[in-house]
Amino acid sequence: MAKDMTLLWGSGSPPCWRVMIVLEEKNLQAYNSKLLSFEKGEHKSAEVMSMNPRGQLPSFKHGSKVLNESYAACMYLESQFKSQGNKLIPDCPAEQAMMYQRMFEGLTLAQKMADVIYYSWKVPEAERHDSAVKRNKENLSTELKLWEEYLQKTSGSFVAGKSFSLADVSVFPGVAYLFRFGLTEERYPQLTAYYNSLKERPSIKASWPPTWLESPQGQDMLKDV
Amino acid sequence: MAKDMTLLWGSGSPPCWRVMIVLEEKNLQAYNSKLLSFEKGEHKSAEVMSMNPRGQLPSFKHGSKVLNESYAACMYLESQFKSQGNKLIPDCPAEQAMMYQRMFEGLTLAQKMADVIYYSWKVPEAERHDSAVKRNKENLSTELKLWEEYLQKTSGSFVAGKSFSLADVSVFPGVAYLFRFGLTEERYPQLTAYYNSLKERPSIKASWPPTWLESPQGQDMLKDV
């Protein structure tokens, strides 16, 4: 089955990482994997554009079925391989509701993170304002405090209850990215505990960004968030 | 079942409308519905904040289960009431893949729409730039042309294939919002045909924004997009 699958991905990208974690969790490791370089602009190559007119990674294919949106690929894989590997959507209605709620709140977290980390990359120099940088950091901090509360209530190991789920698949890569960019452990103890606990999970370890392994030192952009 | 459900919503809001369409499609019309006013700031009321710390609409509850993210509520309702009303996730793997892909691409469409329509509301006056307004409009136009192509390929009635699905639930309210804000029919014939066809669907008619019925005249903000 996995031999029919092709994933084009970039190292460190949270959306790519989500798909890779699900492929690990569902025992679909035999997929065709191709690491591309954002720095070299390979996400705009003809190979990517033919699968993904947006020129983005991940670009994912199962046979002739194209699923480039990371949430779409994750939902599809869980649905098609429900009884293979680990179950990623809980049956219990209360746990399932919490899982969907946190999974989609994860998009807001990702957005507020991107507003800070990609600011200089996304906003042309003539349109940049210190006031916007400050506000984006405050918004990210407010968002992160909400997740601190959520994790306190679930007592820490998983983001939506008692078991690893698509909510963790969606949220963990962003959390790791935040720490990679200098989030301070002292200010976010629950997120730190969550990060430290999940980074040892086999599916996550196996898909850890190779560029992070090569140069373990991250950046300090978020040290004052 | 639906009597255990409460939806706090605002008229015209695409995320609120998504949940209302699913409730109609799944024959759950007996839910407790409370229309709140964004203009009066009722989305920041104590009632909303107690269900939704983000102070946003929709705020949705099924018993004690809270699902405020519209995509989360839609996924949950389809999962819990699979065999009730209309099936909103196709079984066929190819159709399902397309459905998830379009559903999540819908978030990008919503984002690019928001970047244009909410610009003055979101960006403080001292940080506004004509160049950003122009770029946002161009990005929205590029995005809409992609959807024109998608609709051409599916031959128009539904956004992800042969039947109405969660992809339409996710995308249609945004399309209606675009036309409400002045998108021109001449430039987007496929989106226009899609809009005209789906606006007659019973679930959509029954949940049409009451403020739009009261004052049918929209705005012309998008006339040059």
Curated annotation (Swiss-Prot), chains A, B:
Domain GST C-terminal: start-end pairs: 92-217
Location(s) in or outside the cell: Cytoplasm
Catalytic reaction annotation: RX + glutathione = an S-substituted glutathione + a halide anion + H(+)
UniProtKB keywords: Cytoplasm, Transferase
GO molecular function per UniProt: glutathione transferase activity; maleylacetoacetate isomerase activity
Domain (GST N-terminal): residue spans on this chain: 3-85
Keyword Cytoplasm: yes
Pfam families: GST_C_3, GST_N_2
GO biological process, any: glutathione metabolic process
Cellular component per GO, a single term: mitochondrion
Residues that bind glutathione: R18
Keyword match DNA damage: no
Tissues in which the UniProt entry reports expression: Found in all the tissues examined. Highest values found in liver and in intestinal mucosa.
Induction: By epoxides and by antioxidants.
Enzyme Commission number(s) from the entry: 2.5.1.18
Record PROSITE patterns: GST_CTER, GST_NTER
PANTHER family in the cross-refs: MALEYLACETOACETATE ISOMERASE
Subunit architecture: Homodimer.
Family to which this protein belongs: Belongs to the GST superfamily. Theta family.
Function: Conjugation of reduced glutathione to a wide number of exogenous and endogenous hydrophobic electrophiles.
Name the UniProt record assigns to this protein: Glutathione S-transferase A
